[in-house]
């Protein structure tokens, strides 16, 4: 099973992704491919936002298992929306493949937090 832990608040977001979906054999596992695609897209977006100084602090540990991404969003509503979009996408995959993907969300932003 792939485990995805999301820690978030109005100032930061952290994604920890590890494990194996075991939906199909290696190289043919569409669940693993879907999660991997989202993780790589998230890492690329975080890296780009960091390099453009849109987010003040970011770290990516790509060679670790679990894969670990951390970003201080600075309370930027647009950046928080990007992070929330990835949370939604991970949850959708977990909803479609509950035996293969589990998402744990720790903390959340309230509407007032994005100011």
Give the location of each predicted region.
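N-terminal intrinsically disordered, cationic/polar leader segments
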Residues: 1-30, 40, 44-115
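Short, conserved glycine- and acidic-residue-centered signature motifs
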Residues: 31-35
């Amino acid at each position: 099973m792939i485990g995805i832990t999301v820690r978030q608040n109005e100032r930061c977001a952290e994604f920890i992704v590890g494990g194996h979906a075991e939906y199909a054999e290696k190289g043919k596992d569409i669940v693993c491919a879907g999660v991997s695609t989202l993780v790589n897209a998230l890492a690329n977006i975080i890296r780009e936002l960091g390099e453009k100084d849109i987010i003040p602090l970011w770290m990516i540990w790509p060679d670790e298992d679990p894969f670990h991404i951390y970003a201080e969003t600075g309370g930027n509503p647009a950046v928080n929306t990007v992070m929330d979009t990835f949370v939604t996408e991970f949850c959708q995959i977990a909803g479609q493949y509950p035996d293969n993907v589990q998402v744990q969300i720790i903390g959340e932003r309230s509407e007032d937090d994005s100011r």
